[in-house]
């Protein structure tokens, strides 16, 4: 039991979107009140792990001062309530392809959401996916292709078999989350460093190769690990036909949003109230 608690306390230490140069982690602001001011727009929700509400996880939460344990994990009960809210209130939930189509046509009118998951650990197929399937809600899963089936900082990644099964659902979109560039050096995401153009291009090629071999398709959307943008990678992906690039820069998608810089909101229990309030104010897609 103590081993499980230790894993839960430390499993989220790699998940952060902003760093300062001296290596000290800068705390991201997930409040969002000041951002949700647009009358029309699409918010892209970002989830990482959806955990069952157990004695072990509750104890880990109560003793941990690691804010990332609270900010990057959502309890299953809370997640189900959030998805049920979207369904019962007839909030339009778009696929990532529908979002990109609206951007291209400048047809972002009213309000809607897109649901995304990063990394794709076991909690998606085991906990979150059954709820999404039951409620008939679309989502996009961003996959670290080189880490599928492995354990990363205490999180057991989903297998290709699990990913493929979800991908067979027409409501599910599979996207790229790099092949093996989801890590940090000196508290800085590797894509934020002076990593060479050759390295990022080769990594992207490996991701696309894995998609072709395992899912029999080409990835059309991409999400930056930690939200760390890289111009060399962006240019290369756009030339290769990537249709949408997602960041972790908070904001609302409007007709002015570039499909190469699509903002997302990391969902927490605390900021969900703000998100709900915005969605229930004027207009829907």
Indicate residue ranges for each PLM-predicted region.
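Glycine-rich, phosphate-binding/catalytic loops in enzymes
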Residues: 62, 131-134, 240
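N-terminal pre-catalytic segment of deacetylase/amide-hydrolase enzymes
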Residues: 10-111, 285
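C-terminal domain-boundary segment and adjacent tail
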Residues: 71-105, 212, 234, 238-272, ...
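Functionally critical loop-and-helix segments that line ligand-binding/catalytic clefts
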Residues: 272-278
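Short, solvent-exposed loop/turn elements at domain surfaces
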Residues: 52-57, 125, 271-272
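Hydrophobic membrane-insertion alpha-helices, especially the h-region
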Residues: 1-11
């Amino acid at each position: 039991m103590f081993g499980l608690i230790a894993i839960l306390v430390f499993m989220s230490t790699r998940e952060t979107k902003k760093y300062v140069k001296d290596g000290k982690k800068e705390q991201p602001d997930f409040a969002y009140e000041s951002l949700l001011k647009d009358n029309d727009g699409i918010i892209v929700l970002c989830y990482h792990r959806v955990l069952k509400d157990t004695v072990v996880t509750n104890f880990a939460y109560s003793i941990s001062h690691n804010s990332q344990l609270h900010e990057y994990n959502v309890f299953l009960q809370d997640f189900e309530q959030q998805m049920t809210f979207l369904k019962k209130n007839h909030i339009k939930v778009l696929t990532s392809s529908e979002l990109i189509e609206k951007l291209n046509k400048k047809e972002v009118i009213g309000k809607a959401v897109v649901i995304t998951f990063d990394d794709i650990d076991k909690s998606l197929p085991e906990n979150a996916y059954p709820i999404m399937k039951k409620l008939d809600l679309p989502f996009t899963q961003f996959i670290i292709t080189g880490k599928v089936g492995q354990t990363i900082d205490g999180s057991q990644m989903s297998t290709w078999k699990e990913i493929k099964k979800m991908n067979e659902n027409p409501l599910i979109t599979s996207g790229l989350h790099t092949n093996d560039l989801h890590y940090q050096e000196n508290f800085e995401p590797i894509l934020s460093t002076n990593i060479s153009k050759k390295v990022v291009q080769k990594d992207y090629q490996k991701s696309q190769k894995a998609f072709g071999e395992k899912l029999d398709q080409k990835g059309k959307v991409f999400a930056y690990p930690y939200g760390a943008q890289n111009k060399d990678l962006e240019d290369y992906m756009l030339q290769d036909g990537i249709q949408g690039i997602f960041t972790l820069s908070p904001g609302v998608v409007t007709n002015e949003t570039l499909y190469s810089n699509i903002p997302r909101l990391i969902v927490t229990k605390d900021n969900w109230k703000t998100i709900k309030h915005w969605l229930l104010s004027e207009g829907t897609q």
